[in-house]
Amino acid sequence: MERKRWECPALPQGWEREEVPRRSGLSAGHRDVFYYSPSGKKFRSKPQLARYLGGSMDLSTFDFRTGKMLMSKMNKSRQRVRYDSSNQVKGKPDLNTALPVRQTASIFKQPVTKITNHPSNKVKSDPQKAVDQPRQLFWEKKLSGLNAFDIAEELVKTMDLPKGLQGVGPGCTDETLLSAIASALHTSTMPITGQLSAAVEKNPGVWLNTTQPLCKAFMVTDEDIRKQEELVQQVRKRLEEALMADMLAHVEELARDGEAPLDKACAEDDDEEDEEEEEEEPDPDPEMEHV
């Protein structure tokens, strides 16, 4: 096997580099690189070389395969050192807006008085405040086609929306509108007014108000409130009747289950009372019987 050694100029004087080609196997043609110290010690990897040299030489930019120093890494290292030195002079900016606490030996925290030339300045936005994640336009359309089932695995009939509620946007159906309004009621704290801008019908992608559901602007009248109150009263009445019927059925079931044990207990009590009366009855006087 052919072995050749060359002096490595990137390492201290006396170090040699050797390349050994592989003759067989899947990695035939691949060359293994070894380094030899002036004393003849063999090194097979860069970590071994770094451990042997220690702090006498910086091998962070040394390429073990080629035996050369990489200039690109050397430039980056120099820039990093220059940047660190400049940062030490200028100092790092303090992004914390909280008032500092005086470092004293007292067990109580003593705040530092803040003095400013512009006391009227106020922070318009707080970056630490949680911000709602952005959503896609017409994201409510993802809710279309979803159905609800009751405990008996039967399809729940969807409710009918009032005639005053009309959808807006491309492909907005009644199901999409119902899902959008229900989602807005549960996730938004703002009043639901619909899309107030008339230009939204011409170009919904530009003039759409993302804080409102996909419906046109609507007004709630006194007649709508009265109808809603009537519906609520009807639902409450049906609920009351259902609860009353369930309670009566429960009472009848308890009475039916308790009739047989109750009759048996009453019969046992009567037998005990008869036995006690027979025991308490006095014996007849023999003189009275003779008379």
UniProtKB/Swiss-Prot annotation:
GO terms for molecular function: DNA binding; methyl-CpG binding. There is a cross-link at residues 73, 90, 92 (Glycyl lysine isopeptide (Lys-Gly) (interchain with G-Cter in SUMO2)). Residues 254-267 have a biased composition (Basic and acidic residues). Residues 254-291 are annotated as: Disordered. InterPro entries: DNA-bd_dom_sf, MBD2/MBD3_p55-bd, MeCpG-bd_2/3_C_dom, Methyl_CpG_DNA-bd. Residues 1-72 form the MBD domain. Its main location: nucleus. Keywords: Chromosome, Coiled coil, DNA-binding, Isopeptide bond, Nucleus, Phosphoprotein, Transcription, Transcription regulation, Ubl conjugation. Residues 216-245 form a coiled coil. Residues 60-80 are annotated as: Required for interaction with MBD3L2. It comes from the Eukaryota. The modification Phosphoserine is found at residues 56, 85, 144. Residues 268-291 have a biased composition (Acidic residues). GO terms for cellular component: chromatin; cytoplasm; heterochromatin; nucleoplasm; nucleus; NuRD complex; protein-containing complex. Residues 1-80 are annotated as: Required for interaction with MBD2. Heterodimer (via N-terminus) with MBD2. Component of the MeCP1 histone deacetylase complex. Component of the nucleosome remodeling and deacetylase (NuRD) repressor complex, composed of core proteins MTA1, MTA2, MTA3, RBBP4, RBBP7, HDAC1, HDAC2, MBD2, MBD3, and peripherally associated proteins CDK2AP1, CDK2AP2, GATAD2A, GATAD2B, CHD3, CHD4 and CHD5. The exact stoichiometry of the NuRD complex is unknown, and some subunits such as MBD2 and MBD3, GATAD2A and GATAD2B, and CHD3, CHD4 and CHD5 define mutually exclusive NuRD complexes. This is Methyl-CpG-binding domain protein 3. It comes from Homo sapiens. The gene is MBD3.
